[in-house]
Amino acid sequence: MRGKVARMMTKLIFGAVIAATMSGPAGADDLLRLAIGQRGLWDSSIAEIGQTAGIFRRNRLELQVVYTSGGGETQQAVISGSVDVGVSAGTLGVLGAYAKGAPVRIIAGEATGTAEYYFVRSDSPVGKDFAGVTPNMTLAYSTAGSGTHITALRFMKERNFTAKLTATGNVPATFTQVMSGQVDIGFSTPPFGLDAIEAGQIRLVALANDLPSIRSQTVRVIIANASDLARRREVYARFIGAYREAIDWMYADEKAIAPFAQYAGISPAMARRVRDNFYPKAMLQLDRVMGLPELIEDAIAFKYVPRALTPAQIAELLQTPKRP
């Protein structure tokens, strides 16, 4: 009798272990590691605020977020496999990396147009729309291949001036270098620098969206490591769906203002101004890489790629979401 009970207990315990083993992974959240350029901006906050609001958890996702100094650094983290997803990588930089054989895929648009602006110290001789720029002056961008790198190149080309391009890292570091006189012309993105403009410490030179080639094109994208994307395609589809849900919530619900204000270290009034005045929701569309033919032309002109990508290459590179 005792042996029979022992055998029954063994079967029950074994069955419980098997059930736990089988149910554990199915109920667990899938982990995605994200690298995001430029902490503190409206569009760089989406993953973190969406996770705090429980949106990604509802979609059975756990995000681990690290921040980089710009799109080039973000791109390298994805290529190396240090992270799974890169948010806000410069589109031309991604085209160049893919053309060289890097294991990277575009899984969504990130910024069609951009909120960036260019500024100088109030005592600078540089005027509106880069008037007075000389070849020995320095013009900032974050990292090689980033959206700010692309924008700086386009301004020089379309406004017909020459300056020394200088990598300055993230927005706060760039501001410090301009104010200390190390760099002549800096870039920034709201909310950074708005208080300095109001205080008369700096002057606005140009908006990136002044350029038609910027405001009508998807200048930044969300990218994934090709190997992990192929292995976990359903997880990435769920991620983009949750990311879209987070964007919708952040524009529809005023409750999103307080966490963004805390995230960026600004007042709720400034947080609302940043969202409503500088980041139209259409800028953050995920479904398309808009202006791709022109982007490829620029990639050739700026020597990111030696020649146009073939239709087969474009089909492989673009893994943008399909609407349900």
Residue spans of the language-model regions?
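Bacterial N-terminal signal peptides that target proteins for export
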Residues: 2-14
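Hydrophobic helical h-region of N-terminal Sec-dependent signal peptides
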Residues: 14-18, 22
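Sec/Tat signal peptide C-region and signal peptidase I cleavage site
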Residues: 24-28
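Short, solvent-exposed loop/beta-turn-alpha elements that line the ligand-binding surface or hinge
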Residues: 58, 132, 210-215, 280-288
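Periplasmic-binding protein-like
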Residues: 110-120, 203-229, 312-324
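Secondary-structure end/capping motifs
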Residues: 230-306
